[in-house]
């Protein structure tokens, strides 16, 4: 049974609960993460959530999301989910927005209530998306993604819509830092 870490309003751990029990009509705040993957050309990977996903099926979102297990570091959880959702190896995992939180309700009435740090990482292998998680994947520029979000925010996950404006200037900075480290 997959467990998630419950957190207070400041993002500090206060307990654990099964993932299946956490996501419902009145979801307690819990720890999650979002990750944006960039390639060697500086393009961002966006994915469309699988149609069988319980929340926000079929919407476009960041590269992948997930929940750290109790006792697991966020960076380890990011690496684990990159492999699970995308069959992807990543490096230069950086927490770009450490204090992002959001509450949103999807069309089925399921609420998300997450303290959700936003990461940027670099792809170091090719993609092999898991069809249970990802319906489609596409590489795009940061400016093209911003234009698409502005034109049709309803086609994207609410967490992506909320954090992308803050994230966009940090993406180029991350790419330069990763290149400098090589």
Swiss-Prot record:
Binding residues for Mg(2+): 65, 85
Pathway(s) the chain acts in: Isoprenoid biosynthesis; dimethylallyl diphosphate biosynthesis; dimethylallyl diphosphate from isopentenyl diphosphate: step 1/1
Coiled coil location: none
Location in the cell: Cytoplasm
Listed cofactors: Mg(2+); Mn(2+)
Main location: cytoplasm
EC number of the protein: 5.3.3.2
Lipid biosynthesis is among the record's keywords: no
Domain (Nudix hydrolase): residue spans on this chain: 28-162
Gene Ontology cellular-component annotations: cytoplasm
Annotated protein name in UniProt: Isopentenyl-diphosphate Delta-isomerase
């Amino acid at each position: 049974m997959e467990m998630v870490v419950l957190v207070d309003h400041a993002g500090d751990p206060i307990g654990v609960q099964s993932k299946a029990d956490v996501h419902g009509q009145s979801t307690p705040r819990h720890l999650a993460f979002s990750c944006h993957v960039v390639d060697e050309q500086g393009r961002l990977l966006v994915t469309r959530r699988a149609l069988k996903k319980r929340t926000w099926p079929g919407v476009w979102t960041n590269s992948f999301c997930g929940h750290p297990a109790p006792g697991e570091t966020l960076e380890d959880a990011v690496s684990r989910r990159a492999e699970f959702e995308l069959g992807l190896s990543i490096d230069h995992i950086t927490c770009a927005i450490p204090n992002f939180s959001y509450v949103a309700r999807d069309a089925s009435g399921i609420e998300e209530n997450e303290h959700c740090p936003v990461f940027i990482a670099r792809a170091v292998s090719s993609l092999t998306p898991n069809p249970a998680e990802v319906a489609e994947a596409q590489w795009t520029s940061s400016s093209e993604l911003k234009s698409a979000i502005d034109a049709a925010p309803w086609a994207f996950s609410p967490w992506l819509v909320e954090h992308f404006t803050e994230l966009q200037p940090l993406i180029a900075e991350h790419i330069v830092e990763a290149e400098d480290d090589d």
